[in-house]
Amino acid sequence: MRWLLLYYALCFSLSKASAHTVELNNMFGQIQSPGYPDSYPSDSEVTWNITVPDGFRIKLYFMHFNLESSYLCEYDYVKVETEDQVLATFCGRETTDTEQTPGQEVVLSPGSFMSITFRSDFSNEERFTGFDAHYMAVDVDECKEREDEELSCDHYCHNYIGGYYCSCRFGYILHTDNRTCRVECSDNLFTQRTGVITSPDFPNPYPKSSECLYTIELEEGFMVNLQFEDIFDIEDHPEVPCPYDYIKIKVGPKVLGPFCGEKAPEPISTQSHSVLILFHSDNSGENRGWRLSYRAAGNECPELQPPVHGKIEPSQAKYFFKDQVLVSCDTGYKVLKDNVEMDTFQIECLKDGTWSNKIPTCKIVDCRAPGELEHGLITFSTRNNLTTYKSEIKYSCQEPYYKMLNNNTGIYTCSAQGVWMNKVLGRSLPTCLPVCGLPKFSRKLMARIFNGRPAQKGTTPWIAMLSHLNGQPFCGGSLLGSSWIVTAAHCLHQSLDPEDPTLRDSDLLSPSDFKIILGKHWRLRSDENEQHLGVKHTTLHPQYDPNTFENDVALVELLESPVLNAFVMPICLPEGPQQEGAMVIVSGWGKQFLQRFPETLMEIEIPIVDHSTCQKAYAPLKKKVTRDMICAGEKEGGKDACAGDSGGPMVTLNRERGQWYLVGTVSWGDDCGKKDRYGVYSYIHHNKDWIQRVTGVRN
């Protein structure tokens, strides 16, 4: 029914000798000759004007065509045309040299309008059925078919049904004409002392319709010099100077240019620190653009000479405003400026052509006086005791009473950093350790002398006397290292209540209650070799038992270190367990068998007794001899430590080294020198780890 209505709307008959025009606005339709499919009338003329929306064109094709033949279509014909152009003229039944039928040919209008005219003359000798044609609107792909440069897209074209639109590459914006792509280049600021400026997209053609502004703004005192490169291509005109695209350079009120064409301008010295470069392009042209480099120039500063033993960086033939120079010195030298030493010093060329400061001098590094070494000496390798770079000194310890730890060379060199350096210790000073167990005065091992004998003065320099402040001695001890005394723990507390034999802090002697005397020989008399020292702190062995005398050992820390000499020297800690039968010497000021105190230091030589033998000797008395104890003495008695000797040293000689080692400290026994009753001593080897942990003493 729909096609029937369309057929009646488009196909109708016309009277003879009449002309008729039909206006068609649909997007598609059908056109037929009058009376189709019957023969068309003579002397007839019909025009169909087809109009579709902009962005479309009209496609026309024939399904049937049968008209009168004539030379060049003089009689009957169908003419297809636009406003100003005939697209085709058809007649006849088939194409010949002088007439053309549409056949399968499709006729396309260039625009949105097409006019189709059918005309028949006054007579037809035969029956001709006319034509049946169809038309439809088809989209125009403007992106492919647009040939007019002023209407085509600069960058990207996007077609859609009935039209198209343009877009631009990244960094560009679309002009108000909706087809031209331009750049936003009006706020380019350059502040570096050198740089390169180009037209947008250089060396590709620069965008159209652009207004670019480049500002070079340097610190006052500089002058901008411009240099265009060889590639220079800006649209120009053979008769009018730069009417289309151009560069202008503005320096203050002065304007240079315009510049265009293919010849680059000569180098330009602006004599200013502020320059504006303007670049204009119109809406046409395909030129490559331009590129220039700029460089800041300033006043020249005088030539520089490096200081003696120094250098300047960078080293240049000429220096200009804002150039900076760093002055440094050779290894072992320091920059000296206004009596201040520094690693480097920087000066700058000022805008008036002068340097910001004078070149400083280079002074040799001075390590100054080396640090004092406790118990040591310093020897300079140079005659004048120089302390400057590469000078050498040697530390040594006060022999024979001190030795250097780890046998260090003690040689230090003044380094480039201004500090004394040792290859092993770096800047740390060496350590002088007390020499132990090597008395200046040697003794002869005594044969079996009953009840001991007076000790030769200076042969026991490690012995210490524990004395009340009133001068009354009460125990002995041994010097360890430079500031510790090892003694018996029972020497440092009062007698305990037999009914409550618990050791309390209140039972302990206060450090202020007693003193230590070193270099002592006479029991009560004094001489010039003695050193009286205060007590800083006391430490009892944590497992000390005052009832059984287990771990009967204590340490006394001195307020100050004694001066080591021929009469004061520490004893060495044992390096291993003591062998049974080895001879030891016990020293002290304790009572003799006549139950009176001696005038001088006494000593006895006795052998070490087997541990099991000692245990059996005390078994009847129900007294334990534990592993932290060691026994010594004669089976027949007569030689033993006694009251007043507690805490005193029991030592032995290492014959290979000639050094004396501490074996034990006097602890307890059954009477003094009694037969089958040996002296019991606190075994130092058993407690060596604890002693070293508290004191830090090493041999």
Swiss-Prot record:
SUPFAM superfamilies: Complement control module/SCR domain, EGF/Laminin, Spermadhesin, CUB domain, Trypsin-like serine proteases
Summary of the tissues where the protein is detected: Protein of the plasma which is primarily expressed by liver.
Region Interaction with FCN2, residue ranges: 20-278
Amino acids binding Ca(2+) 2: D139, V140, E142, N159, Y160, G163
GO BP annotations listed: complement activation, lectin pathway; negative regulation of complement activation; proteolysis
Residues bound to Ca(2+) 1: E68, D76, D121, S123
PROSITE patterns the UniProt entry points to: ASX_HYDROXYL (PS00010), CUB (PS01180), EGF_2 (PS01186), EGF_CA (PS01187), SUSHI (PS50923), TRYPSIN_DOM (PS50240), TRYPSIN_HIS (PS00134), TRYPSIN_SER (PS00135)
Family statement: Belongs to the peptidase S1 family.
GO molecular function, one term: serine-type endopeptidase activity
A GO cellular component entry from the record: extracellular region
Protein name, as recorded: Mannan-binding lectin serine protease 1
Domain Peptidase S1: 449-696
Glycosylated residue positions: N49, N178, N385, N407
Consequence of substituting E68 to A/Q: Partial loss of interaction with FCN2, FCN3 and MBL2
Domain of life: Eukaryota
Activity regulation note: Inhibited by SERPING1 and A2M.
Annotated CDD domains: CCP, CUB, EGF_CA, Tryp_SPc
Keyword Nucleotide-binding carried by entry: no
Effect listed in the UniProt record for changing N283A: Partial loss of interaction with FCN2, FCN3 and MBL2
EC category name: hydrolase
Gene3D superfamilies documented for this protein: Complement Module, domain 1, Laminin, Spermadhesin, CUB domain, Trypsin-like serine proteases
Maturation and modification: The iron and 2-oxoglutarate dependent 3-hydroxylation of aspartate and asparagine is (R) stereospecific within EGF domains. N-glycosylated. Some N-linked glycan are of the complex-type.
Feature type site, description Cleavage: R448, I449
Annotated CUB domain residues: 20-138, 185-297
Keywords: Autocatalytic cleavage, Calcium, Complement activation lectin pathway, Disease variant, Disulfide bond, EGF-like domain, Glycoprotein, Hydrolase, Hydroxylation, Immunity, Innate immunity, Metal-binding, Protease, Repeat, Secreted, Serine protease, Signal, Sushi
Disulfide pattern: C73-C91, C143-C157, C153-C166, C168-C181, C185-C212, C242-C260, C301-C349, C329-C362, C367-C414, C397-C432, C436-C572, C475-C491, C614-C631, C642-C672
